[in-house]
Amino acid sequence: MVSTLDDTKRNAIAEKLADAKLLQELIIENQERFLRESTDNEISNRIRDFLEDDRKNLGIIETVIVQYGIQKEPRQTVREMVDQVRQLMQGSQLNFFEKVAQHELLKHKQVMSGLLVHKAAQKVGADVLAAIGPLNTVNFENRAHQEQLKGILEILGVRELTGQDADQGIWGRVQDAIAAFSGAVGSAVTQGSDKQDMNIQDVIRMDHNKVNILFTELQQSNDPQKIQEYFGQIYKDLTAHAEAEEEVLYPRVRSFYGEGDTQELYDEQSEMKRLLEQIKAISPSAPEFKDRVRQLADIVMDHVRQEESTLFAAIRNNLSSEQTEQWATEFKAAKSKIQQRLGGQATGAGV
């Protein structure tokens, strides 16, 4: 049987993503405080722009965590560091310049974390790269913010040392630095638009793409340990996806998608869950393991084709953009709770 659904490398990346979410929340908290403390209109406007970007980026990080499929808590050392920085920002030990300098270091830490997650994903699997893809937007935004924060620090530092304003060429240099890489900024998630979230079709399609990659990776591998790793992720992803659809989506579409078509979706997922449990009881090195996985993949991809054609069309024809975005938010929240439950279940030998 499959001895564990967990994988050490994937869990380590999940912890890094949890760290990034906690840091992003601190970054937002700092910038809200800076707006209350700043007396410079130009600096306030820059920080206000940062805040808008970073609130969206927090949504992107939350989406990536759900798509990644493993929920973890931030590391204790990171929680302690966040508490220490929060105390410094709330206190009077540091002046405004020093607080912004500490904040720029946080941005740098967030950039490096994002790059490390991307590099680690290249080693773990194509499905991980697919799940964390939107983090590229967060990384580019943070690099752009770093350049602007350097400009802010130059202005504040000159004022502190001389009591006078710095030369006006600072912002021009900052904009030139940003332009060197800003062309790569963009995201299919929420950044660069007025959307508050992805729509439900986009979120479900991302799940479909990821599990398809996992099936391909599993079938191409001859390493029982990697096969076990891929199946563990397939099991958790499909379980969370199916339960979230049955909680948030299917009951709501029945009225306009039709009783028969909706019931077919339920029936397909019931068969999928049955096969998942059967496969979990088979050793990854057994000859029939891949055959059963192939059977599961066929059922899943038939299900995918139905959802992405007729179901998505029915959703487009019956819901507003705001409604599909709200459904996406609720779907991700439901998946997150299910993932936390799955992560808390015993996954040692005998699973």
Curated annotation (Swiss-Prot):
Coiled-coil spans in chain: none
InterPro entries tied to this protein: Hemerythrin-like
Family from the record: Belongs to the hemerythrin family.
Binding site for Fe cation 2: E245, H303
Pfam families: Hemerythrin
Residues holding Fe cation 1: H241, E245
Gene Ontology molecular-function annotations: metal ion binding
UniProt KW keywords: Iron, Metal-binding, Stress response
The protein's role, per its UniProt record: Acts as a DNA nickase.
PANTHER family reported in the protein's UniProt record: HHE DOMAIN PROTEIN (AFU_ORTHOLOGUE AFUA_4G00730)
Induction: By desiccation.
Protein known as: DNA nickase
